[in-house]
Amino acid sequence: MAITYLKKSPKTSSTDDTKTTGIVQDLLKNIETTKEQGCIDLTKKFDKYDGEIIVSKERIEEIKKTLDQKTKDDVQFSYERVRKFAEAQLKNYGQDFEVELSDGLFAGQKLIPVNTAGCYVPGGRYAHIASAVMSVTTAKVAGVKNVIACSPPKEGVGAHPTIIYTADLCGADVILNLGGVPAIAAMTNGLFNNPPADIIVGPGNQFVAEAKRILFGKVGIDLFAGPTEIGIIADAKADPEIVAVDLVGQAEHGYNSPCWLYTTSKELAEKVMKRVPELIAELPEVPRTNADAAWRDYGEVILCDTDEEMATISDEYAPEHLEVQTENLEWFHKRLTNYGSLFIGEETTVAYGDKCSGTNHILPTKGAGRYTGGLFVGKFVKTLSFQRMTKESTELVGAAAARISRYEGMEAHARTGDVRLKKYGYSS
């Protein structure tokens, strides 16, 4: 059956995006420099408001006393149902469910995988075989029907043979000999006879990361990735050789890979700082060059007085990979809140997680561990809500929705409730 548009919009939601982007960039740059005063000045300019910015408790109490009771009742009605649904979502996290929020009002959620995922597998400086495992496998387990893998080709060869083998083994439906910006653009725009990707995942260099950032919105992405990072929390119990080796193990990724040591032991710190350059000097040329620059320009050793100070500074940095090599491992496990992936005890190390131990190595960087985790099946799954209700439940829900809409000044919204109340024999 052919699709016929009886009315087609002359514009899209992105019609004015370019102009908007420029305006927002200028405003953000202004506020970055002028801080709070910039916010105050712009609020006065755009909103014609020059009062207090922070709402005082006195102002809140004043509103409580002066707001009419019917409005407060309607807000309470909305709050109770939204809270009940949120509690049901938390209880049933990662599962389909349906719950009756009030008599005749049912709401729930369905988990539906995206149709097409694009998986970027780096292959420039190193052949990142494990990245194919991490991205393609997770997408397939999530139920994605169509997985496209892209990896940079070498002259006369194409993508690294082992990357191709790995992507195929893990379930990639299509493998493209494409790298960098062309790969991200091809997956986003559905080139080479493939459907456009709904989400693109996988690590890459700064050009890959920037392409994903620019195209975000047109396509979903896993996260805004930067250079790989390692943080190590270590006390006097830690083995300085292990600590130093692990720092160098991540520094070899690239010249701009941060390496951070948080410790309460000055003796350990001094031993590590002496040993790291020695270990770097023993590496082959390419990893040696990378690690030397990373340690020189991005390496930090931070001496703390207590375990709590180490935990606090680590949470501020929110490292992509965080190792804990201390006496009190379980305390840190419970206390730490910001990181991409945690490696508890000297028996495990970042390389295990990077290559084969099971946890995913596509992780947040640049402090993003404060608000997100790494790649997991949920990145490929949409949590979609639904609701249904009886005609009888319209008496309460329809009337409250109409009143709230009018409080907000949204008359057309209100009338969608009115028309149902009238049809089903209730007064608004």
UniProtKB/Swiss-Prot annotation:
EC numbers listed for it are: 1.1.-.-
The annotation note on the cofactor reads: Binds 1 zinc ion per subunit.
**Which prosthetic group or cofactor does it need?**
Zn(2+)
Transmembrane portions of the chain:
none
What are the alphabetically sorted keywords of the record?
Answer: Metal-binding, Oxidoreductase, Zinc
| A Pfam family this chain is assigned to | Histidinol_dh
Q: Which GO terms describe its biological process?
A: L-histidine biosynthetic process
Concerning InterPro entries, the annotation shows:
Ald_DH/histidinol_DH, Histidinol_DH_CS, Histidinol_DH_monofunct, Hstdl_DH
User: Which EC class is the enzyme in?
Assistant: oxidoreductase
Q: List, alphabetically, the SUPFAM superfamilies matched.
A: ALDH-like
Where, by residue number, does Zn(2+) bind? 250, 253, 354, 413
> Does the UniProt entry include the keyword Zinc?
yes
Q: Which CDD domains match?
A: Histidinol_dh
Return one GO MF term. Answer: NAD binding
Q: Which residues form the active site?
A: 320 (proton acceptor), 321 (proton acceptor)
Give a GO cellular-component term: cytosol
* Family statement drawn from the similarity comment of this UniProt entry: Belongs to the histidinol dehydrogenase family.
Q: What is this protein called?
A: Histidinol dehydrogenase homolog
Q: What organism is the protein native to?
A: Pelagibacter ubique (strain HTCC1062)
